[in-house]
Structure formats: structure tokens, C-alpha cells
Design a protein with these regions (language model features):
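NAD(P)-dependent short-chain dehydrogenase/reductase
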Residues: 139-189, 194-196
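Adenosine-cofactor binding site in Rossmann-like domains, unifying the SAM/SAH pocket
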Residues: 21-45
Length: 291
């Protein structure tokens, strides 16, 4: 299988390439310097030259606060750029897997107490320009490719590559000065480790299953609880992790965050594919890989 990956230098693109390499796939990694998704001609030219069987569109502008301050760029890259990649995939007859986000939801949760998880069939309602631009990308991909597209929503994506919350907390856990670390405790979701996400996405690509899928590791928690678990996994003192309300963070963040964006992998369970493992096991695997 010949696979083209956008966001080739990002944490998910790098992990996905490793999974594909181990499976014997022919992988072409495209960083922004190789393929500018906001430029339609660039997308058509590069994809046309590579002629992949599958396009993994992991490239995006994921700076949530940056998107809030520059919404034009957010929609150009995340929404229109996804249209360009879908058009390019259609021209060569490739399947496309688009990586979306839990930020397409408003964060009020489901159920009477608002603590329930979102399924693929719950209505989205993004509260930030980042979330709206990612939802726009979903619409563009579905409109262009229909059943030749698979949309994967992931939440709190972390892993051994790139810059992410897990690696930041692991570095702080290993800080010999032992300073306290403040972490938000009023936002809940599910971590998604790239090692597990990449495996499931490749299965979806090979199975040629279309539609929308939530793919996150099982088990909801707060950012503070996640940080504390990372400290414990690293053998550090978890009491150094101090809870703080998101509204009390300084400097104030421009973009609102969903208070509860727990994803229910309902479609994945119903598809017959292996379910995502718990985040606890994925966490210890990731710590072992880096320490």
C-alpha cells in the first residue's frame, strides 16, 4: 500500500509512518515545506506525482489560541486545505483519512448532568475558531469524497514524537528541582496516544471503511488527573501537580476550551475492529519508550 501523509513532521504523522513502515507499506511523508495544503495547486501537484493508494491528512494548524487570533488562517489551512487534499485524493482515486478533533463539540457533554461522552451521532457545536475550522474540514472532505473518505476524531493527542502535553509533563516530572506544576482540573476528556491511534487508523485504511469514527483511548479524566498519572508513571511525586481552574490561568488564553469533550468510540466498537486500549496501559508504554 502506497501512503502519503501530510503533517509528516508532526507527532501523529511520524508515528503513522513508523506503523506503516513496519507493515511494509511504501510511505511518503510530506511536511509543510513539501506540500502546502492551503495551496490547491501544491496539493494537486504533489498528490498527483506520488499517486498514493491512501492519503492520511494529519496536517493541520493545531495552535488553538493562534487560530482564535487569526481565524482566516485557521479556515484556510484546516477547512479549505482539507478540501484541497480531498480534491487531490479524488483525482488519483485514493482513499483519504482526515484527522479531526474533539473540539468540534461545545463541551457541555451529554446526559442530564453533562458528564456523558459524545458519540459520532451527537450534534457538534464548536466554541472556538479551531474547532469550527476542523469541523469545516470534516464537511469539505465528506462533500468531495463521500464514501471514499474516513473521518477520525481524536482527543488530547499525545505520544513519543513532537511536542505535546505528555512529553512536557514527563520532562517536568524528571526535573530535579521538584518545582510544583499547575494543571487545569476543570476540563475533562480522553487522552489519545499516537501509537494506538496510528494502528487503528491503518486498520481503517486497509479495511476501506468509510464514515465518521471517534478514536481515543478508553477512560475519561481531567488534565490534572492525567498530569498526576504521568508523574506517577515516571516515578515522580504526583503531589507536585497542583490543580487550577482554567479561568485562573495566566496569561489568559484567547480561545475557549470545551469543559467536557469525552469521546465515545461507538462506531469503532460497532465496526468489528479491535477497540482502543485504556490510556493507563498506553501511558506506561510511552514512558518506557522515552526513559
Amino acid at each position: 500500500m502506497r501512503v502519503l501523509i501530510t503533517g509528516g513532521r508532526g507527532q501523529l504523522g511520524t508515528e503513522f509512518a513508523a506503523v506503516c513502515d513496519s507493515a511494509g507499506d511504501d510511505v511518503v511523508l510530506c511536511a509543510h515545506s513539501d506540500l502546502d495544503v492551503s495551496d490547491r495547486d501544491s496539493a494537486l501537484q504533489v498528490v498527483g506525482a506520488v499517486h498514493p493508494d491512501v492519503v492520511i491528512h494529519a496536517g493541520a494548524w493545531t495552535n488553538v489560541d493562534g487560530c482564535e487570533e487569526d481565524p482566516s488562517r485557521a479556515y484556510l489551512v484546516n477547512a479549505l486545505g482539507s478540501r484541497h487534499m480531498a480534491e487531490a485524493a479524488a483525482l488519483v482515486g485514493a482513499r483519504l483519512l482526515y484527522v479531526s478533533s474533539d473540539y468540534v463539540f461545545d463541551g457541555r457533554g451529554t446526559g442530564p448532568d453533562g458528564g456523558g461522552a459524545y458519540t459520532e451521532w451527537d450534534p457538534p457545536g464548536p466554541i472556538s475558531h479551531y474547532g469550527r475550522s476542523k469541523l469545516g474540514g470534516e464537511h469539505e472532505v465528506a462533500a468531495v469524497l463521500g464514501p471514499a473518505a474516513t473521518i477520525v476524531r481524536a482527543s488530547w493527542v499525545v505520544g513519543r514524537y513532537g511536542a505535546n502535553f505528555f512529553k512536557t509533563m514527563l520532562r517536568l516530572a524528571n526535573d530535579r528541582e521538584g518545582k510544583p506544576v499547575t494543571v487545569v482540573d476543570d476540563q475533562r476528556g480522553c487522552p489519545t496516544f499516537t501509537a494506538d491511534l496510528a494502528v487503528v487508523m491503518r486498520r481503517l485504511a486497509v479495511s476501506r471503511i468509510p464514515g465518521l469514527f471517534h478514536v481515543s483511548n478508553e477512560g475519561p479524566l481531567s488534565w490534572h488527573e492525567f498530569a498526576s498519572a504521568i508523574f506517577r508513571a515516571a516515578g515522580a511525586d504526583a503531589s507536585r501537580v497542583v490543580p487550577i481552574a482554567g479561568a485562573d490561568l495566566r496569561p489568559i488564553r484567547p480561545a475557549p476550551r470545551p469543559a467536557s469533550s469525552i469521546l465515545d468510540n461507538a462506531a469503532l466498537r460497532g465496526s468489528g475492529l479491535a477497540p482502543m486500549p485504556s490510556w493507563e496501559g498506553a501511558l506506561y508504554d510511552a514512558v518506557a519508550a522515552l526513559q
